[in-house]
């Protein structure tokens, strides 16, 4: 394989953008493991008191992630996210107002490999979420296991992430004052196994928990689609039914996280590595779907609203796809 190295005269601004994305990839793939290791290593050094004090704090603070978390605007507004946004670049597009007196369940599609669009738009202020949607506070859901990692849990809570379980989402949606938007990557980790350039396959047909959640609390549903999310990485071929896909699916069920074999570019060369390609992402926020509150929704009611949601998501995709270089004959595939 011929390696294409980056030129020496890359502008300093672009180097900062690459560095910002590098730290994000590291935080996504290895920061939790590093924090766990650090916690235990410190116990066997003269700095053992740090882990002991943190352990006490951790015990007292155990339920915070499921009760709205602990946001840190200093982190959400840090300049590093602006550099990351400009690397791709990433844009947030508003198609309708969101009433700050209402709560929302936002469905984000597709998951992609590393959820770059959803993270940048809803966990940082780099794309101006609060300017576009004043009075709305977004909370991105993440696997609960990551909130059990010392130090790392505080970092992700600062960005506005909360555990992806019913209790955590309900805590926010029960607030009658409104203004909370619970953002769910509906396809979850399994959908990342279908993330590759040109793919528009969404794992949603049997994913109805987010719809039921919206009905339970009378929260409006908002479809969101990020054009370009699946263009960031190549992935080893793993068609459904292949031996590789079967292994990945089995590991996903055992571990709770998917393991897509992805690759893109490196820091100093463009031929291989785990740094995403510089491909634009446009996140389109659709119009809200009004939902009537029902503490005991029937299966038929959930199915009906789920169908409406998929229709609105398809409509959102079709209305905007040509603006983002998606061929006219390409359509969403729901599985």
Swiss-Prot record:
Cell location: Endoplasmic reticulum membrane; Cytoplasm, Perinuclear region
SUPFAM superfamilies reported for this sequence: Glycerol-3-phosphate (1)-acyltransferase
Similarity comment: family membership: Belongs to the diacylglycerol acyltransferase family.
Origin superkingdom: Eukaryota
Function, in words: Catalyzes the formation of diacylglycerol from 2-monoacylglycerol and fatty acyl-CoA.
Recorded catalytic activity of this chain's protein: a 2-acylglycerol + an acyl-CoA = a 1,2-diacylglycerol + CoA; a 2-acylglycerol + an acyl-CoA = a 1,2-diacyl-sn-glycerol + CoA; a 2-acylglycerol + an acyl-CoA = a 2,3-diacyl-sn-glycerol + CoA; a 1-acylglycerol + an acyl-CoA = a 1,2-diacylglycerol + CoA
EC number: 2.3.1.20, 2.3.1.22
Pathway participation: Glycerolipid metabolism; triacylglycerol biosynthesis
Species assigned in the record: Xenopus laevis (African clawed frog)
Membrane topology recorded in Swiss-Prot or TrEMBL: Multi-pass membrane protein
Enzyme class: transferase
GO molecular function: 2-acylglycerol O-acyltransferase activity; diacylglycerol O-acyltransferase activity
Protein name: 2-acylglycerol O-acyltransferase 2-A
């Amino acid at each position: 394989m011929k390696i294409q190295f980056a030129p020496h005269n890359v502008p300093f601004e672009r180097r900062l953008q690459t560095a910002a994305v590098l730290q994000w990839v590291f935080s996504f793939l290895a920061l939790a493991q590093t924090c766990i290791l650090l916690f235990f290593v410190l116990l066997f050094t003269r700095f053992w008191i740090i882990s002991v004090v943190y352990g006490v704090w951790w015990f007292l603070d155990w339920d915070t992630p499921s009760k709205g978390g602990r946001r840190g605007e200093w982190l959400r507004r840090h300049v590093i996210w602006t550099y990351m946004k400009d690397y791709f670049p990433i844009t947030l597009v508003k198609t309708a107002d969101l009433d700050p007196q209402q709560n929302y369940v936002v469905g984000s599609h597709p998951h992609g490999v590393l959820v770059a669009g959803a993270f940048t738009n809803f966990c940082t202020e780099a794309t101006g979420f609060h300017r576009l949607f004043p009075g709305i506070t977004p909370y991105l859901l993440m696997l609960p296991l990551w909130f059990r990692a010392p130090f790392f849990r505080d970092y992700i809570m600062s960005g506005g992430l909360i555990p992806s379980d019913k209790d955590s989402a309900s805590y926010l949606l029960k607030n009658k004052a409104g203004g909370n938007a619970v953002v769910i990557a509906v396809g979850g980790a399994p959908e990342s196994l279908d993330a590759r350039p040109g793919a528009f396959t969404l794992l949603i047909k049997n994913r109805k928990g987010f719809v039921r959640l919206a009905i339970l609390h009378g929260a409006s549903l908002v479809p969101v689609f990020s054009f370009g999310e699946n263009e960031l990485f190549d992935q080893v071929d793993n068609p459904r039914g292949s031996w590789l896909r079967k292994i990945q699916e089995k590991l996903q069920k055992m571990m709770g996280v998917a393991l897509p074999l992805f690759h893109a570019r490196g820091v100093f060369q463009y031929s291989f590595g785990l740094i995403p390609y510089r491909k634009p992402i446009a996140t389109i926020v659709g119009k809200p779907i009004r939902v009537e509150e029902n503490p005991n929704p029937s299966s038929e009611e959930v199915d009906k609203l789920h169908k409406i949601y998929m229709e609105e998501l398809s409509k959102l995709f079709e209305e905007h796809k040509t603006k983002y270089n998606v061929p006219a004959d390409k359509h969403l595939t729901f599985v």
